[in-house]
């Protein structure tokens, strides 16, 4: 419909500059209202009617022992740091705060990620390995996602101890090796594919797997869903079970941290 969005000059003056350069929400809402009748959104379940179901479940675990002590100590240190800051200091220290929240998330994954001398257990790791062992015994293939490549390295060592075969895909994996591993996983007897969420969340077809485990939840659910869709896509013949491993009763939930 030529002219529906005005001439480019008028569109730029009334929509583009206010919305893009000035972050004018009203201008953006006006544009959305105008184009909404012309936007067709099709859901996967409407297009792929023969695609097996996707069953999602949150698996909750509690911190215990030394891991709980480290978590509490880090939260206390963060609170003291924030209490000492003025409003202006808080505005300029957001990167530092995010870094501290990342450390908190790593403690929840496995304290050994930031404390080299930590030798105690991780409740999350123990639960995850138990889930994988049970799934492997039942003949399933698993996609295991984490945002931390160091966490994937740690999980890989545990898989080796349990004599569970795996592939590993991170941002450093070459394009050629990436393609070869995907092909192999879909045809051989390898049981687990450990994947960095950012490196492997899109562009992979891994329908040999029918179990997906998100070891550390991400704040952007759409990113997690894209990762899940590496298995839940055209070519999948089985119901896909998706598990997100989280801690319960953590103060960090109140501060918006996803653990």
Predicted regions: what they are:
Residues 1-45, 236-239:
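Conserved P-loop NTPase motor "coupling/switch" region that bridges the ATPase
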Residues 49-72, 86-204:
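Conserved Helicase C-terminal RecA-like lobe
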Residues 77-84:
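Cytochrome P450 catalytic domain signature, combining two hallmark sequence patches
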Residues 170, 215-218:
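Short beta->alpha connector loops at strand-helix junctions that form conserved
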Residues 199, 208, 217, 236:
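Short, conserved catalytic or interaction motifs in soluble domains
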Residues 204-216, 241-243:
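A short beta-strand element within the Helicase C-terminal
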Residues 222-235:
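Conserved SF2 helicase motif VI
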């Amino acid at each position: 419909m030529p002219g529906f969005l005005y001439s480019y000059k008028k569109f730029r003056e009334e929509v583009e500059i206010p919305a893009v350069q000035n972050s004018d929400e009203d201008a953006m809402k006006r544009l959305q209202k105008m184009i909404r009748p012309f936007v067709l959104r099709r859901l996967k379940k409407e297009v792929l009617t023969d695609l097996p179901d996707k069953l999602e479940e949150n698996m909750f675990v509690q911190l215990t022992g030394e891991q709980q002590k480290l978590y509490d100590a880090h939260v206390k240190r963060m609170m003291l740091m924030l209490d000492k800051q003025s409003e202006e200091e808080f505005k300029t220290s957001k990167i530092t705060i995010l870094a501290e929240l990342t450390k908190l998330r790593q403690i929840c994954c496995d304290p050994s990620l930031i404390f080299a001398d930590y030798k105690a257990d991780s409740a999350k790791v123990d639960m995850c390995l138990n889930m994988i062992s049970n799934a492997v015994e039942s003949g399933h293939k698993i996609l295991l996602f984490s945002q931390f490549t160091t966490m994937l390295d740690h999980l890989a060592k545990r898989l080796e101890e349990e004599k569970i075969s795996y592939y590993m895909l991170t941002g450093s994996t070459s394009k050629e090796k990436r393609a070869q591993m995907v092909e192999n996983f879909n045809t051989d007897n390898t049981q687990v594919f450990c994947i960095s969420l950012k490196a492997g969340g899109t562009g992979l077809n891994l329908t040999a797997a029918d179990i997906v485990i998100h070891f550390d939840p991400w704040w952007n659910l759409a990113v997690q869903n894209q990762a899940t869709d590496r298995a839940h896509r055209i070519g999948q013949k089985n119901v896909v079970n998706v598990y997100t491993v989280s801690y319960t009763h953590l103060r960090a939930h109140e501060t918006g941290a996803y653990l």
